[in-house]
Structures are given as structure tokens and as C-alpha cells.
């Protein structure tokens, strides 16, 4: 049962069914989601995985892999696992988790694994732009999540987006990819 974390009602879970365990976390398409819609476990899992892969990069560097190839391997085995489904969970990142991921990037940069220093916000912007570029296509599987298009009203002000901005009551919806990106994009234009 997934629920809003700030809900004031106490929800009693149903009695466990025969041979079915009740879990506080679930792994859906490779992303660990808690029952309070928290991604801390997922980020901690990714950081553990990245630490193991940093050791592999260290061994490759000691065996004489040139910096350019080391950079390619770093992109493939560390940056890409952090980018996987990042738009879905990036809005729920807390400051301490963001700082921890940025510390990993700084460590990898200082060890010479990566030539350019990354930040979490750069990765989030890259993945958001890539996804939002493909969402307006009707063939995209998440196209139905977009808000309805704006009606054709004449205005002297040029707008970047032709979508109506959604209203939200709950923080969970506000942190979702589409709502977060639409508001950020409109406020910056």
C-alpha cells in the first residue's frame, strides 16, 4: 500500500494473506520505492553500487588504462546507472542525498576517472530535457501524462510552452516530473 507520507489519518494495513509478505519497500523496474514514496533506499543502493564500480575503475587505472578510455568506462558504469529513470525520482531527492551524490562525483573527478566534474543538477537537467523533448510525440508511452494544450488565445506575450499549467494540492504531485518541469520551464522563460 503506497500512501502520502504526511497523511493525518492512521491507515491500518489489512491482515496479511497466507504466504504473502507485507513489505515497506518495493523494487519496480529497477527503482526502490518505499511505502511513503521515499527514494532514500534507492539512492543508497546506487551509491553502494557506484563505490564498488569506483574500485573497478581504480584497478583499471592501475593496469594502465589511458584517461580517455577511463572516462568512457566511467560514463558507462557510473553516470548511466545514476541517469536511469532519474526524472522519475529526482524531484524527491533531499539535500543530504544530493550532497552525497555530488561528493561521489568530486571523488571520481579527483581520482582522474572523469575529465569534467558533474553535478546532480546537471544530470537532472540533461535527462529532463531529453525526456521532455520526446514526450509531445503522440507515439511516446507517457504522452497521455501531459496536461491538455492551451486554447488558442491571442496574446502579445510569447510563451514557450503550449500546455496549461497543472494545479496541485499535494507535494508528491508537485515533485512529479511533468509538474516540476513545466513550472520550472515556464518560470525561467
Task: Please provide the spans of the model-predicted regions.
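Generic recognition of well-structured, leucine-rich alpha-helical segments
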Residues: 35, 53-63, 80, 85, ...
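Basic, alpha-helical interaction scaffolds
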Residues: 19-87
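Residue-level recognition of alpha-helical structural elements
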Residues: 39, 65-71, 90-97, 116, ...
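Short, conserved micro-motifs composed of acidic
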Residues: 1-24
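Structured loops at beta-to-helix junctions and adjacent beta-edge loops in soluble globular domains
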Residues: 2-5, 31-36, 168, 180-182
